[in-house]
C-alpha cells in the first residue's frame, strides 16, 4: 500500500548560463518524488521542465503543489503494485499534469522493481540497448565558443 508521497523541489546549478530563446537558466529546477510503501520499499520519480512555464503548462513549483495537494491524497492507501489502477484513477480524476503523473508512475515502477529485485527496464519489456547517445546543447549564447 502507498503510505506516503513526499516531494522535494531541487535547483541543480548549471555549469554555465543556459540561454534559451525564452529564458536564461542558471539552474535546472526539478521535483523529486518519493513514494513510501507499507512494506518499507521506497520508489523515486522525477519531474522536470525547462524555463518555468515557457516549456509547457506545468512548472516545477506547480508540479510540487499539485502532487502535494491533489495527487498524494488521492493515491495514499492504494495498492502500490497495481500501477495501472493508480494511473487510471489519476487519469479519471485529474486533468493534465502530465509531468506530475509521470513522476508518480516512475516512482511506482521504481518501487515495484525494487520489490521484485529487477530493474524498471525489465518491467517495461526488457532493455533494448546498453548505452544511449548524448546530446550537448549549444546554449551559452556564443555559438563559436560552444563549438
Where are the regions a protein language model picked out?
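N-terminal capping/lid subdomain adjacent to the active-site entrance of alpha/beta enzymes
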Residues: 1-147
Amino acid at each position: 500500500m502507498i503510505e506516503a508521497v513526499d516531494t522535494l523541489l531541487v535547483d541543480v546549478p548549471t555549469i554555465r548560463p543556459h540561454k534559451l530563446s525564452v529564458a536564461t537558466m542558471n539552474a535546472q529546477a526539478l521535483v523529486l518524488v518519493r513514494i513510501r510503501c507499507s512494506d518499507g520499499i521506497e520508489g523515486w520519480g522525477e519531474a522536470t521542465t525547462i524555463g518555468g512555464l515557457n516549456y509547457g503548462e506545468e512548472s516545477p513549483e506547480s508540479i510540487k503543489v499539485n502532487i502535494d495537494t491533489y495527487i498524494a491524497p488521492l493515491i495514499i492507501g492504494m495498492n502500490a503494485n497495481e500501477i495501472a489502477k493508480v494511473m487510471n484513477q489519476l487519469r479519471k480524476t485529474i486533468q493534465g499534469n502530465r509531468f506530475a503523473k509521470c513522476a508518480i508512475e516512475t516512482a511506482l515502477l521504481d518501487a515495484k522493481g525494487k520489490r521484485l529485485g529487477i530493474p524498471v527496464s525489465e518491467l517495461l519489456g526488457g532493455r533494448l540497448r546498453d548505452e544511449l547517445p548524448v546530446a550537448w546543447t549549444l546554449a551559452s549564447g556564443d555559438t563559436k565558443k560552444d563549438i
